[in-house]
């Protein structure tokens, strides 16, 4: 195994050191009036002095890894590589927030990130919607908006990855700057406004990736025993969700979501109707009882009228805001139960400013707040929704997760699956195995033998 790991490391180092990368000058804009050609990976922005420092540090780690791997087995080297990213990650804090985000997506798209080779502990595995998740920890929408890096992100050890939000027509989103760090509080404020390359570009990318994943699945199936429920998604290893949004200027929201279903659902293991971003005017009004019911009916009909194989159509979820009243939650729960919605994601970012950020001047920026200060609000709402839906609908807990204990609290409150984004932005790749390891300890500490046993434990 050491020999294979050494070969893999050497190949990775060569690619990193010698691959020529096309550059995209910082601040360059795309033309919204035309659909850009799909590419397998995003352009890397021009490196500033800080960017060159970051690159140099990463190259140094690659060289050190090459020297270390010759004496380590694959699993040991894998752990070392994830831990080594802790050295690189602080350099991202020196960069502009959106530039750092683009750089991270570019790295993941090119495979310049650690790849998890160690199998997940059996205690973390669970079945949802007829799919086997190797672990319940997923990456929320917003990181890989345009499906540029799904393979690299899934390879890092997430149980599932959600891309988007994807709008029908390309749009730039709101003016920059639009992402703001509150580092002391472990939070971010964003007002991106559904910046998206559009469904045509994303569909091309997902189609190309779909073919690769199918090949990987075929290879894995031929070498493993058959099972009634296969691990991974419909088109290969890893579960892929697609989050759908509406265009800012669209007058028919339902038509936008239906267009997303028609173009992207064949590549998705689940679909998400995003009606909760605070950065698109009027979007959150779609969470009202009548509006949501009408919208979900139209989207379900569009999905169900398509031709599906034995696996059937992808599950349909709705992502809701954390700033809802008890009455609004009751209305959403009633719609979800009446229409047999497949799941809810709780929650999106908040427009409120909890006491934890009140002394930070950045908190006055307009936009949705995510990260640690959102944890209590989103978890309390998750707990309420589990009660209102009587535990009959799978819930994805999202908001403020930055540790295994946080993920465990979400699960006990009623989450079947858990997502993170801001925690990943601050913690980097090393946070993924750390959360899974801590989650296992939490489960074993309280005597649970599986994730399923712990779901909703606070209600029993």
Curated annotation (Swiss-Prot):
EC number: 1.3.5.2
Subcellular location: Mitochondrion inner membrane
UniProt binding sites for FMN: 141-145, 165, 243, 274, 319, 347, 371, 400, 421-422
Disordered, as annotated region: 213-245
Pathway named in the protein's UniProt entry: Pyrimidine metabolism; UMP biosynthesis via de novo pathway; orotate from (S)-dihydroorotate (quinone route): step 1/1
Name of the protein in question: Dihydroorotate dehydrogenase (quinone), mitochondrial
Enzyme class: oxidoreductase
Cofactor binding summary note: Binds 1 FMN per subunit.
Named cofactor requirement(s): FMN
UniProt key word Mitochondrion: yes
Pfam families from the UniProt entry: DHO_dh
PANTHER family per the UniProt record, alphabetical: DIHYDROOROTATE DEHYDROGENASE (QUINONE), MITOCHONDRIAL, DIHYDROOROTATE DEHYDROGENASE (QUINONE), MITOCHONDRIAL-RELATED
Similarity section: Belongs to the dihydroorotate dehydrogenase family. Type 2 subfamily.
Topology in the lipid bilayer: Single-pass membrane protein
GO cellular component: mitochondrial inner membrane; mitochondrion; plastid
BP terms from Gene Ontology: 'de novo' pyrimidine nucleobase biosynthetic process; 'de novo' UMP biosynthetic process; pyrimidine ribonucleotide biosynthetic process
SUPFAM superfamilies documented for this protein: FMN-linked oxidoreductases (SSF51395)
Presence of the UniProt keyword Mitochondrion in the record: yes
Annotated source species: Arabidopsis thaliana (Mouse-ear cress)
């Amino acid at each position: 195994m050491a020999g294979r790991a050494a070969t893999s490391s050497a190949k990775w180092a060569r690619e990193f050191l010698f691959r020529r990368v096309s550059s995209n000058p910082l601040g360059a804009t795309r033309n919204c009036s035309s659909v850009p050609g799909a590419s397998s990976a995003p352009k890397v922005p021009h490196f500033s002095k800080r960017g060159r420092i970051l690159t140099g540090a990463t190259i140094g780690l690659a060289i050190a890894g090459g020297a270390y791997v010759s004496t380590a087995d694959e699993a040991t080297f894998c752990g070392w590589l994830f831990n080594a990213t802790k050295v690189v990650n602080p350099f991202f804090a020196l960069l502009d927030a959106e530039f750092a985000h683009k750089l991270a997506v570019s790295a993941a798209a090119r495979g310049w990130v650690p790849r998890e080779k160690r199998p997940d502990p059996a205690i973390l595995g669970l079945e949802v919607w007829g799919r086997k998740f190797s672990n319940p920890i997923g990456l929320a929408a917003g990181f890989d908006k345009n499906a540029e890096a799904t393979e690299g992100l899934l390879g890092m050890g997430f149980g599932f990855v959600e891309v988007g939000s994807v709008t029908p027509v390309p749009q730039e989103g709101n003016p920059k700057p639009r992402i703001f760090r509150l580092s002391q509080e472990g939070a971010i404020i964003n007002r991106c406004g559904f910046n998206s390359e559009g469904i045509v570009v994303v569909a091309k990318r997902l189609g190309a990736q779909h073919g690769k994943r199918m090949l990987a699945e075929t290879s894995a199936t031929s070498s493993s025993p058959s099972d009634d429920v296969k691990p991974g998604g419909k088109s290969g290893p890893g579960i892929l969700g697609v989050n759908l949004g509406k265009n800012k200027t669209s007058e028919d929201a339902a038509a936008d979501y239906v267009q997303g279903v028609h173009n992207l659902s064949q590549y998705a293991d689940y679909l998400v109707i995003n009606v909760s971003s605070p950065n698109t005017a009027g979007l959150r009004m779609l969470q009202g009882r009548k509006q949501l019911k009408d919208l979900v009916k139209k989207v379900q009909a569009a999905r169900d009228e398509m031709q599906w194989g034995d696996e059937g159509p992808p599950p349909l979820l709705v992502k809701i805001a954390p700033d809802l009243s008890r009455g609004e939650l009751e209305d959403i729960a009633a719609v979800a139960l009446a229409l047999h919605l497949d799941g809810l994601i709780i929650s999106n970012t908040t427009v409120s400013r909890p006491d934890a950020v009140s002394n930070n001047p950045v908190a006055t920026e307009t936009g949705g707040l995510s990260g640690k200060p959102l944890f209590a609000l989103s978890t309390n709402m998750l707990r309420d929704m589990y009660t209102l839906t009587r535990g009959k609908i799978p819930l994805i807990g999202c908001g403020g997760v930055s540790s295994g204990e946080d993920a465990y609290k979400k699960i006990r409150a009623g989450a079947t699956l858990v997502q993170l984004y801001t925690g990943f932005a601050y913690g980097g790749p090393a946070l993924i195995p750390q959360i899974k390891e801590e989650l296992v300890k939490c489960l074993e500490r309280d005597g649970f033998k599986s994730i399923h046993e712990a779901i909703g434990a606070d209600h029993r």
